[in-house]
Amino acid sequence: MYRAVTRNIEVQVRPFYLEDRSDPSENRYVWGYQITIDNQSDEFVQLLSRYWHITDGAGRVEEVRGPGVVGDQPELNPGDSYQYTSGCPLSTPSGIMVGHYTMRNKRGETFDIAIPAFSLDLPGTRRTVN
């Protein structure tokens, strides 16, 4: 489990390899990741957008930006949590992801919260990125 806390909002990530969607003979490796966002602050927040910086085992970088997560822009009151699962394909057996969410509070202020860096490593292989 990987975790980061920004402004009392905790982001936890649990990555896992999706063997049934991967095909190493075709250089296709697919990971899922489960994210939990826990609003431990004393203010309402809404997740507006996401940013990912994805680096594969060969050092190739892909940046992904978009509104919300999995088609949702969740609203979290103090004490609320939100969980979702998504995925990431790579052409190498290892990689690393890191990023942030842009949030908005009731006053209309926007700010970024960190998504912790986490490894994507094929089970049983040597790590090459991290």
From Swiss-Prot:
Gene3D superfamilies: ApaG domain. Pfam families: DUF525. Residues 3-127 form the ApaG domain. It comes from the Bacteria. One of its GO terms (biological process) is error-free translesion synthesis. HAMAP family: ApaG. This is Protein ApaG. The gene is apaG.
